[in-house]
Amino acid sequence: MTVNSQRHSVLLDNVYSLIDKKVDAQQKSLVQQFGRLLYKNISNDDLENRNDSDLYGATLSLWSGLAKFKSTAPYIRVFNPEIEKHGWHSSHTIVEIIVNDMPFLVDSVRMSLNRLNITAHLFLHSPIAIKRNDKAQVTAFAEPGKTLEGTRKETVIFIEVDRQTSKSDIETLTKELHSVVDEVSLAVADWQDMTGKLQTVIKDTAKFNWPVSAAHKKQTKTFLEWLSDHNFTMMGYRYYEVKAIEGDHRWIPANDTSLGLLKNSINDRERLLSKLPASAREEALSDHPLILTKTNSRSRVHRPAYMDYVGVKVFNKDGNVVGEHRFLGLYSASFYNMSVTQLPILKEKVQEICALSGFEPGTHAFKAFENIVETYPRDELLQTPADELAQIVMGIFQMQERGISRLFIRKDVFGRFFSCMVFVPRERYNTQLRKETQALLKASLGAKEEVEFTTFFSESVYARTHYIARVKDNNAEYDVKEIEKNIIE
């Protein structure tokens, strides 16, 4: 044991001694056990420059919160501890959260701090098996790795964040945390119902009258089955009825079917298809059984990506769209890590665009073309029509290793963004060029916010950066060659 480790061990022992001296005899053993569970994973670095009295105060403060916690509502407290008022001090603002244990909680809380540009200087969290009596008082803790009859897991979170000096800042953070915990609770509470709904949809596909070939129906059903096999994190579900009216269509939400996060928009109103761009109207009423796209908003649960939207269309016997089962969530890591040749729907699309290339299978050209597809952004592979994707991939292939710069732009069919793929020689790529390209795309395409980017390096001589320019309407006119010229210059 190092000198620092010994000192930190003594520091925590002093905390437990203070509990022994100051806490009521009937509770002190429980409070000591709670402290050991709370600090069992704290690092030596996190204990540096701390004193036993403040750690004791933090422990007692959380213990008090644990006593107040009722399983029906989360306990969330944000405050600046003061010696005179709380008996202990911290130079940071303290966040205490106690909730029933659930998935995604810690990631979602971290995301909420990041959205507010608040840094966490200490983040302790632990699911603890707690036994309470009929008055909700804590009576026992199960030791890690051991079971104790009558316990329920509760997650205790203690965070030290940048000091929030104003009352409004503290209120904003508190409100944000309540909102996030509520969203996590909604998604987790309805998870089983949402996965059950997907299973029902899979069983009922024969009733949906999809006006496509038997092979296409099989591919679609296989994809939905793959999603249900833990490859899609469910966040929300709702059914929409589609009614044709004179010269238009209405998407009518069946709000009583809402599950998960879509319960937050329970009063969602019906929408006219005519309000959408022409490409979106065409997609919504097309023969394609599925709508695969992204939502307009980032997930506040699990990871901060734009949520994935899987719409399963229902047709009548005349081949007209009459309904949609809408699932919102996030594709799991397997979607991004598995080979495209193993992913339902994508593997068929890859086969189609490789066939469109005209290259003979097994040739060097075919393998090079196939490799471009394999390493292409997965979301783009899924959302881009096969014929358009084949043209883009052929354009990339034709660049070969010539050291030129190229820009490829795809319009989102729902009119919400431009997807821009920029290839530049690796030796040219740097942060300054990336920032200049972001500014150029924002101005040229009329983006309403900062252009997002993801850069990919491979063995190629090129650096590939995928930019997303979010707009109110992507029908704006633009000149790809002119933008490309400005990037080169």
Explain the meaning of each model-derived region:
Residues 131-163, 466-467:
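Extended charged low-complexity segments that act as oligomerization/scaffolding linkers
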